[in-house]
């Protein structure tokens, strides 16, 4: 296991440097924060996972929940390293068993995510993981679903925060502690 101290820079700066900005994608005016270069580097992926593991190793967790879709990339790795279970929170219609659903607002319209109704039990301690916090809608929906099942949502975690979009402030105001590795200004 590589220690974060083996990274060539400060671990946070190292992760930040591996995130590519793609202007005007998927639409004009958007600065898309692409994590694929980070994932393509074994060293960067190890540093990222170690940051999450070091944060939660003593948190007495039962599960790491991952938000569809890019939260699925990191969350199961972190769950494995912590020897806890993984709970998928999926876009509607993707889970085969009985589910609970939660809708949230998008810029134009709504989206819905769901969780298996037996994904966790009352009192289970869970951290929600996603790649990025923008408006906070998906993470808030995940929080609401987990709490509806009786779980204790310990924290929300993401690689990137886009604080100018207000999602992290919204989540904190709703009582969800947050951990993000790095942040970028703007959209």
Curated annotation (Swiss-Prot):
It catalyses: AMP + diphosphate = 5-phospho-alpha-D-ribose 1-diphosphate + adenine. Pathway: Purine metabolism; AMP biosynthesis via salvage pathway; AMP from adenine: step 1/1. Its main location: cytoplasm. Its EC number is 2.4.2.7. Pfam families: Pribosyltran. InterPro entries: Ade_phspho_trans, PRibTrfase_dom, PRTase-like, UPRTase/APRTase. GO terms for molecular function: adenine binding; adenine phosphoribosyltransferase activity; AMP binding. The keyword Translocase does not apply. CDD domains: PRTases_typeI (cd06223). It is found in: Cytoplasm. Keywords: Cytoplasm, Glycosyltransferase, Purine salvage, Transferase. One of its GO terms (biological process) is AMP salvage. Belongs to the purine/pyrimidine phosphoribosyltransferase family. Homodimer. Catalyzes a salvage reaction resulting in the formation of AMP, that is energically less costly than de novo synthesis. PANTHER family: ADENINE PHOSPHORIBOSYLTRANSFERASE (PTHR32315:SF3). This is Adenine phosphoribosyltransferase. It comes from Burkholderia pseudomallei (strain 668). The gene is apt.
């Amino acid at each position: 296991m590589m220690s974060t101290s083996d990274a060539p820079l400060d671990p946070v700066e190292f992760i930040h440097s591996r995130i590519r900005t793609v202007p005007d994608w998927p639409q004009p005016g958007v600065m898309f924060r692409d994590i694929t270069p980070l994932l393509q580097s074994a060293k960067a992926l190890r540093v990222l996972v170690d940051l999450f593991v070091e944060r939660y190793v003593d948190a007495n967790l039962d599960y790491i929940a991952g938000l569809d879709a890019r939260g699925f990339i990191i969350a199961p790795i972190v769950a494995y390293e912590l020897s806890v279970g993984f709970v998928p929170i999926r876009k509607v219609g993707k889970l085969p068993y009985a589910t609970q659903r939660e809708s949230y607002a998008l810029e134009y319209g709504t989206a819905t995510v769901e969780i298996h109704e037996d994904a966790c039990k009352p009192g289970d301690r869970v951290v929600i993981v996603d790649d990025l916090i923008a408006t906070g809608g998906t993470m808030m929906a995940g929080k609401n679903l987990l709490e509806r099942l009786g779980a204790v949502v310990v924290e929300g975690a993401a690689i990137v925060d886009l604080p100018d979009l207000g999602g992290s402030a919204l989540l904190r105001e709703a009582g969800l502690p947050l951990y993000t590795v790095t942040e970028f200004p703007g959209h």
